[in-house]
Amino acid sequence: MASREGAIERARRFFDGDNAQGASGFKALLAELVAIPSTAQEEGREAELHRYLDGAIRPWLERLGFRATIHPNPLPGFGPILTAERIEDPARPTVLLYGHGDTVRGLDDQWREGLKPWTLTEEGDRWYGRGTADNKGQHALNIAALEAVLAERGGKLGFNVKVVIEMAEERGSKGLREFVAAHARDLAADVLIASDGPRVEPEVPTIATGTRGSFHFDLVVRLREGGVHSGHWGGLTTDPAIILAHALGSIMDRNGRILVRGWLPAGGVPPAVKAGLEGCPVGGGGEAATIDPGW
């Protein structure tokens, strides 16, 4: 009888290479993806961006019963976007998976001896290679997990799945906003799983239900045309730098505490969120950023 535990065991065997395929499990699959130099930050790689989707991801998804399409980016000069869907029953929930197959520059000459950007290399319990952690490894794991569920349940998931994989994330996801706006109905789903972010600690699987947002704006003080000499006019004319410093100081105090009430959730952090975060480890030190307790 099909079970959740059975699907997890199938996925585990595939990841560990402990299955009928032997060593050609997830590591071999990821090695093939890493070997495609699909960097979005180097000129002349357009063919590799297409090859990653058309030669690797689309055939895999189609083998699992997805209908997949590769679209040109709405903005010229940026990588294509793949969408795919597998609808078992429109009345059932739909999951949308996001990933990106492009990587940062290879920087071949900056890797230490024994490592290359487009070759998957295992050292201890770590795998090295461009895309292993950002983001080929993540979306490959998600698709492999779906494959394990399909195998366990005789070709049925019990829910619908849509996939979007872009090839311009490392250039600011240029064109993705326009693409989503134009295909909003096709990408409609009940839940989004975007596996592209850090763990709180390398050994701790992390589910993030939200991320810090940002709002960009220019804060400008224009008092006069041209500049004046501080030796002649210092202390007599208004200094725009001081005005800006006080404006920034009214937004956040010296310890990073936000002072603008409208930027904070009403009533503070919800109790459910506090409970979910209780006991959650926070990384720091080593290769990570230093955690400042007072900030």
What are these model-predicted stretches?
Residues 208-222:
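Flexible glycine/proline-rich, aromatic-decorated loop/lid segments
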Residues 31, 58, 140-143, 147, ...:
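Predominant activation on well-ordered alpha-helical scaffold segments within soluble catalytic domains
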Residues 2-132, 151-159:
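Acidic/His- and Gly-rich active-site-bordering loop/insert found
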Residues 126, 131-210, 277:
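Acidic/histidine-rich catalytic neighborhood of metal-dependent amide-processing enzymes
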Residues 19, 61, 65, 150, ...:
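Structural signal for hydrophobic packing residues in well-ordered secondary-structure cores
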Residues 127-129, 225-231:
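Short small-residue beta-strand/loop micro-motif enriched in glycine and branched aliphatics
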Residues 200, 209, 230-295:
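Acidic-enriched catalytic cores of C-N bond-cleaving enzymes acting on peptides and small amides
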